[in-house]
């Protein structure tokens, strides 16, 4: 896929032309760096999020989140989600199995949106789906883009 930012006057159909062509080099340099920052920050966010679940314990997570929202078997799902958020968060940070874990986390966010947050409305302050939708879409974008040049996936030369 060509990620070159066009700076010439003849722009192909469907492409945009930079208002200030002098920025093309900056954008081309920053694209992989910015994508890496996004991947790492999302991984850190999942680690921070799962820390609360570990402090509560799987039984409390199962009772307060899964069983309360009709997701059964609640204890099994508590363990699965805690594993996914912990291991997936670390893998996003280092860029290992990036596409797999980003897709799995995007699916988790979709399920959380539909079963837990949607009935509460949009606003995150009221437990709504605002935050979950955003993180889910960012995970989807990471799954499509992959780990990028600054990832273990790239270092080993293989990814899903």
Where are the regions that the model predicts?
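Extended, low-polarity transmembrane helix blocks
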Residues: 1-53, 75-83, 87, 93-160
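Membrane-interface interhelical connector segments
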Residues: 54-76
């Amino acid at each position: 896929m060509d990620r070159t930012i066009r700076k010439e006057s003849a722009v192909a159909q469907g492409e945009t032309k930079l208002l200030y062509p002098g920025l093309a080099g900056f954008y081309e340099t920053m694209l992989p760096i910015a994508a890496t920052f996004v991947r790492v920050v999302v991984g850190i966010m999942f680690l921070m999020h799962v820390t609360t679940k570990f402090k509560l314990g799987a039984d409390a997570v199962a009772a307060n989140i899964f069983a309360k929202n009709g997701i059964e078997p609640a204890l099994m799902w508590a363990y699965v989600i805690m594993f996914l958020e912990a291991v997936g968060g670390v893998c996003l940070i280092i860029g290992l199995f990036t596409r797999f874990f980003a897709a799995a986390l995007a699916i988790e966010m979709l399920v959380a949106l539909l079963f837990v947050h949607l009935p509460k409305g949009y606003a995150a302050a009221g437990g709504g789906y605002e935050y979950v939708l955003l993180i889910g879409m960012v995970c989807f974008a990471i799954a499509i883009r992959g780990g990028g040049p600054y990832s273990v996936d790239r270092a080993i030369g293989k990814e899903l």
